[in-house]
A protein has these predicted regions:
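Hydrophobic alpha-helical segments at protein termini of multi-pass membrane proteins
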Residues: 1-402
Length: 402
């Protein structure tokens, strides 16, 4: 053992040295600093636009639908669960980084377009010209960071859709605060209620849908072995996100230019639901179908890579079957919670997640996927050691694993 390196009994770590792990910690600290600075910037931006009372009311309205949509998104994350800190990071990027950057670039682009096209034409076309490019790029950058810096977690299409949708959800939440603040200032609670139904209810999944397309492309790139597809998939996903965004924003702009007069009630109950049916629902169906295909591939990885682990004793036969049966796994976790409380539930969940992580770590090695040296992920043997430790702890607690 090299001098100064701490002893980690019973756990085999990758070959990365202290400097590798130092780089990882430095990157995490830098990311935390970015979130902190952009959070302050976003709060200052909102604080200069609206009084505190308006921010509180509109902030509550913008936050209300978030748990519902987050639950729908996380429902897609079935078999190979993503770490909570990365899910939160994706959401925060959309909420404080992408919105802050997009606000100022969109504002600058609108000024330029006004000077070139005139106020009427620019007002109608700017949301369809600049917003899709600026916003999908600022949101998509979070997915690029995850793709390159979290290779051990960003494994496939399902992961890409989940991370992308959470980035979009964070973006939509803060964007809604701005829109809600404007209409609340002008029209009070009646105006806020109107826009809440339009943006948070009828079209609340639009931004998650857009960025989910980018994530799906990157996720497919991660799992394919074809060089052409690996390069083409992210580009297709990114352009699909921008195209859908442009169509969504451009519909209203074209109606404005055409001179068609639409009443607020028609806009709320006909136009927006109609746009959702035409643009949103088919695209969401496609993403869900991609996710379902991704589930099947995840099941194959788990079953193929853990077959020999049953013989080794790392995974029991019953656990092997549980890992690809979400209903039964949930039932066992509920039983652990009812009999042994949060500690037993957490320990059993940890066992199941480590077993699945072992399967995907083996799959990465089989595909020749190289992880960054600073990414302190356990080796295959390290996962086996850790699983044995957790199993012993569960046995000592009297928790049945299956």
């Amino acid at each position: 053992m090299s001098p100064g390196r701490p002893s980690l009994p019973n756990i085999t770590l990758p070959s990365g040295n202290l400097s590798d792990r130092g780089i990882r910690h430095l990157m995490l600290a830098a990311l935390g600093g970015v979130f902190f600075l952009f959070s302050i910037g976003t709060l200052i931006l909102l604080g200069t636009k609206f009084p505190l009372g308006t921010l509180i009311v509109c902030g509550i309205a913008a936050i209300l639908p978030v748990p519902i949509y987050a639950a729908l998104i996380l429902w897609l994350d079935r078999y190979e669960k993503e770490p909570a800190f990365l899910l939160v990071a994706a959401f925060l990027w959309g909420a404080v980084v992408a919105t802050f950057v997009s606000y100022f670039i969109n504002t600058g682009a609108a000024v330029v377009l006004h000077s070139i096209l005139g106020p009427k034409l620019a007002g109608a076309l700017s949301p369809a010209l600049s917003a899709p490019i600026v916003e999908e790029t600022s949101k998509g950058f979070a997915l690029l960071l995850l793709y390159f810096l979290a290779k051990n977690e960003f494994n496939n299409v399902v992961d890409g859709i989940v991370y992308g949708a959470l980035v979009g959800l964070g973006f939509a939440m803060v964007e809604n605060i701005i829109y809600f603040g404007r209409i609340y200032t002008a029209g009070g609670m009646a105006g806020l209620g109107y826009l809440f139904v339009m943006r948070a209810v009828f079209s609340g999944l639009i931004h998650p849908l857009f960025t989910g397309c980018t994530g799906a492309g990157l996720g497919y790139s991660r799992e394919t072995t074809s060089g052409v597809r690996k390069l083409a998939a992210p580009v297709i996903g990114y352009f699909a996100a921008m195209m859908l965004h442009a169509l969504w924003n451009g519909t209203g702009g074209l109606l404005d230019l055409s001179g068609v007069q639409i009443s607020p009630m028609v806009a709320l109950f006909v136009l927006v639901p109609g746009m959702m049916l035409i643009y949103g629902v088919p695209s969401i169906v496609v993403l869900v179908m991609l996710a379902k295909a991704g589930w099947k591939r995840e099941i194959v990885v788990i079953q193929e890579q853990l077959k020999d682990e049953v013989k080794r004793g790392t995974v029991s036969e019953t656990e092997y079957n549980l890992l690809t049966n979400t209903r039964e796994r949930f039932r066992h976790l509920v039983r652990a919670f009812s009999k042994h409380g949060p500690t037993g539930w957490l320990a059993l969940r940890s066992l199941y997640e480590m077993q699945v992580d072992l399967a995907f770590r083996k799959d990465q090695e089989a595909r020749g996927e190289k992880l960054p040296s600073y990414d302190a992920v356990l080796t295959v043997d390290g996962f086996r050691e850790r699983i044995g430790q957790v199993r012993k702890r569960l046995s000592d607690m009297g928790v049945a694993t299956a």
